[in-house]
Regions:
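Single conserved hydrophobic/aromatic residue that forms the stacking wall/gate
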Residues: 1-9, 13
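FAD-dependent oxidoreductase catalytic-site/capping-region signature
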Residues: 10, 14-15, 131, 137-188, ...
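N-terminal glycine-rich phosphate/pyrophosphate-binding loop and immediately adjacent elements
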Residues: 10, 14-135, 295, 305-314
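Residue-level detector of alpha-helix initiation sites
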Residues: 19, 23-28, 266-267, 515, ...
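Conserved redox-cofactor binding core of oxidoreductases
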Residues: 118-239, 243-245, 309-333
């Protein structure tokens, strides 16, 4: 049946499952839960269909981020440690969510991330527990092995970097004494190597493409777009449904036979919990919201990866700058339209360095990624010269933020306080990362290609100088997470149990990046998909996949050596 007719039919009965948010996690759940023909699934998305051509083009990342049609573009609160600057937090507002507008970087995280989850009280989330689901979700371009999957819905591509700057990046890492890794999602994450991406046959491979598109015709799956959920319906301590406003402004109340599942992301899920009376009682009362469950952890523990960019001139014409000029863009676009190949078929983050900030650090806490074109921080337009940039990302920041309601009106965006560099230890680590980049580009492999440092510039050497630039230019890597974290019920800061069930509320789960206890070491899209895969089995009552006790590399002398 067409979607509208199907919806009218199902309005007469209860849906087995209601999923709020058709993003990176929601699309996975819609696929897996609707595989049982006896269950009906309603997937509600505030955004629209993701059929824009720009979403398919891997190189159009910045264009998609600038397009508010597909981007929530939340404006953060003034950051105290960043001169009061307000950081924009881009989140996908379309089918596929952020997987439809992100940079397509695919990093699972380090094995010890998940050992940390287990040690924090999240039994069943160790590396051995999650590896089977990482494998199940992917179809890796280099085939399956002990670590990688070969038959999953999500196509993951490993590039073979041939551009001079990419090769110089990896070679310089080796010359600086770091290991070279064959697969950052495999046995060894630490080191320099190729950076996987969720791209297939020259097109972005979002969770909408991978999980939702193949099953849109299932008669027991209904997808409603341009519909914003206003609140959850809680009756006698049980979530029984949701209230949403459709594209015409009509308010609709829908009921769930089994469960309501929030997959609205690290911003949207805690916002909806609080709008529904689940959250810190004092804050809810201040917003005029009746308290259903006093849960102080909702919206707290906000994690992100701070980002700082260094820019360098090229001494040879090896950057992508000419391809960004009007004629170059037209030529690249035509080639992509005809062949799905060329410059437009890449996200241009092809290499990465996962490094430790110093002796005693167990596993990488700094991520270095290179782009073969430098852009202006404010306009995101390419610098009009041959240049490249290297991003310093802090993978385990000590600073924590929070999300609070600005209003009891669901249409009003919440307040986002990340508190970047508020903890002095984060500032120390970011300075170390900047100096690592400078050491990297000073190696022989880079010296042939690298000119002067455009930003922050050779004059910025002291801690004070670097802090000045960190204050004015630190930004986000768009990895907001951990705002409804997993943990035992005895932990007052925990919001959900290890099955994603909200403590104290029956029939309600959260399944997305907000339930991470702590952010993973790398881009968060891959672990978010894994979370949805794993919990889809739990929701259906399936036995978890058998654990995989795979070995992983850790520097044998990490206690005394930085590399």
């Amino acid at each position: 049946l067409p979607t509208n007719d199907r919806r009218q039919r199902q309005m007469c009965i209860r849906d087995s499952y209601i999923i709020v948010g058709a993003g990176s996690a929601g699309c996975v759940l819609a696929n897996r839960l609707s595989s049982n023909a006896l269950s009906t699934v309603l997937l509600i998305e505030a955004g629209r269909e993701n059929n824009a051509l720009s979403i398919k083009i891997p190189a159009a990342v910045l264009a998609n981020l600038k397009n508010k049609t597909y981007n929530w573009a939340y404006q953060g609160e003034p950051e105290p440690a960043l001169n009061g600057r307000q950081i924009q937090h881009d989140r996908g507002k379309t089918l596929g969510g952020s997987s439809s507008i992100n940079g397509m970087v695919f990093i699972r995280g380090h094995a010890l991330d998940f050992e940390g989850w287990r040690q924090s009280g999240c039994v069943g989330w160790s590396y051995a527990d999650v590896l089977p689901y990482f494998k199940r979700m992917e179809s890796y371009s280099h085939g399956g092995d002990a670590f990688r999957g070969a038959e999953g819905p999500l196509n993951v591509y490993r590039p073979n970097p041939k551009e001079p700057l990419a090769q110089a990046f990896i070679k310089s890492g080796e010359q600086a004494g770091y290991p070279v890794t064959d697969d950052i999602c495999g046995y060894r994450q630490e080191g320099f190597g190729s950076l996987d991406r969720s791209v297939h046959a020259g097109e972005r491979w979002s969770t909408a493409r991978a999980y939702l598109d193949p099953v849109r015709d299932r008669p027991n799956l209904t997808v409603v777009t341009k519909a914003q959920v206003q609140r959850l319906v809680i009756e006698g301590g049980t979530a029984t449904g949701v209230v949403y406003k459709d594209r015409r402004g009509k308010i609709t109340n829908v009921h769930a036979q089994r469960e309501v599942i929030l997959s609205a992301g690290a911003v949207g899920s805690p916002q909806l919990l609080m709008l529904s009376g689940i959250g810190p009682a004092e804050h809810l009362q201040a917003m005029g919201i009746d308290v259903v469950a006093d849960m102080p952890g909702v919206g707290q523990n906000l994690n992100d990866h701070p980002d700082f960019v260094l820019k360098y001139k090229c001494t040879q014409p090896v950057s992508l700058w000419p391809k960004t000029k009007p004629l170059g863009r037209v030529a690249a676009g035509v080639r992509w339209l005809l062949t799905r190949k060329g410059v437009c078929a890449s996200n241009h983050f092809e290499v990465v360095g996962c490094v430790r900030s110093g002796p005693g650090v167990e596993y990488p806490d700094i991520q270095l990624t290179m782009s073969p074109v430098a852009v202006d921080d404010d306009t995101w337009k390419p610098l009009q010269e041959h240049a490249f940039q290297i991003h310093v990302g802090l993978m385990r920041a000590h600073s924590r933020g929070k999300i609070e309601l600005r209003s009891s009106d669901p249409a009003v965006p919440p307040r986002i306080f990340v508190n970047y560099l508020q903890d002095p230890r984060d500032r120390v680590l970011m300075r170390k990362g900047i100096r690592m980049v400078r050491e990297l580009v000073d190696q022989a492999a880079f010296k042939e290609l690298r000119g002067a440092e455009i930003f922050p510039g050779d004059s910025a050497q002291s801690d004070t100088d670097l802090d000045t630039h960190l204050n004015s230019h630190t930004t986000t890597q768009w990895h907001l997470s951990c705002t409804a974290r997993m943990g035992p019920k005895t932990d007052r800061g925990a919001v959900v149990d290890t099955s994603g069930r909200v403590h104290g509320i029956a029939g309600l789960r959260v399944v997305d990046a907000s339930i991470m206890p702590m952010v993973t070491n790398g881009n968060t899209n891959s672990p978010t998909i894994m979370i949805a895969e794993k919990l889809s089995d739990d929701i259906r009552g399936y036995t978890a996949l058998p654990r995989i006790e795979a070995d992983f590399w850790q520097h044998p002398d990490f206690e005394t050596s930085q590399r």
